[in-house]
């Protein structure tokens, strides 16, 4: 252990940060075996193993966690604001119960992401996968308007945390992580010579997965 950091109590709890040094493993040489990960809204991670052709989905529980806490927080807020309104308080502060629910939600999501990314790292080590390719969709959220509800869900998804957790866990085993830009991939036809804004705007996409081409 190199360092211990104790942060002052906040909302009744304090943070203890333990910093320790580990020997960084060398990156493994590529063997042509990779795992590709497609990040999504309903299925957080859809994975494909190039070695055995296996496809599996991880992260279905994430939206259930989000829905549960959103519903519970909304219920508690409704009761709290009604009580404060009866007392003549027009703009009440958030209650301890509400703040506790937000912390509980944050911890539950963080724990779930850690467990999911740990499972992927262990799977790659077991199957001798030396490269993981994951879609980088952070810019997609900025460039597209998919409606209020969908936009809200997309912005709440902790993609950046997921990237960081996955990257350092894979790095401990010498496994490379590649982030693949995914802008315009859904608008371009599979027959397009390249994936770009120009081809996306020219694409005659009728519906999801259906294109009309001249080829």
Where are these regions (language model features)?
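Well-ordered mid-protein domain cores that form the structural environment of catalytic cofactors
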Residues: 1-7
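Positively charged, helix-rich recognition surfaces that bind polyanionic ligands
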Residues: 8-215
């Amino acid at each position: 252990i190199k360092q211990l950091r104790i942060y002052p109590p906040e909302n009744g709890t304090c943070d203890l940060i333990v910093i320790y040094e580990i020997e960084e493993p060398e990156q493994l040489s590529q063997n042509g075996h990779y795992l590709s990960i497609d990040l999504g809204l309903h299925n957080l991670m859809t994975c494909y193993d190039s070695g055995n052709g296996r496809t599996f989905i991880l992260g279905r529980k994430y939206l259930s966690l989000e829905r549960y806490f959103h519903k519970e927080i909304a219920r508690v807020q409704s009761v709290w604001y009604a009580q404060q309104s009866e007392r003549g308080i027009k703009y009440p502060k958030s209650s301890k119960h509400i703040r506790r629910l937000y912390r509980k939600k944050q911890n539950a999501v963080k724990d779930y992401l850690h467990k999911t990314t740990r499972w992927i790292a262990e799977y790659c080590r077991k199957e001798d996968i030396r490269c993981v390719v994951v879609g980088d969709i952070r810019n997609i959220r900025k460039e597209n308007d998919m409606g209020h509800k969908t936009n809200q869900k997309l912005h709440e998804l902790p993609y950046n945390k997921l990237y960081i957790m996955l990257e350092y866990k894979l790095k401990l085993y010498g496994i490379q992580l590649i982030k693949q830009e995914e802008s315009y991939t859904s608008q371009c036809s599979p027959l397009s010579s390249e994936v770009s804004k120009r081809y996306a705007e020219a694409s005659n996409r009728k519906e999801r997965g259906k294109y009309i081409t001249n080829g």
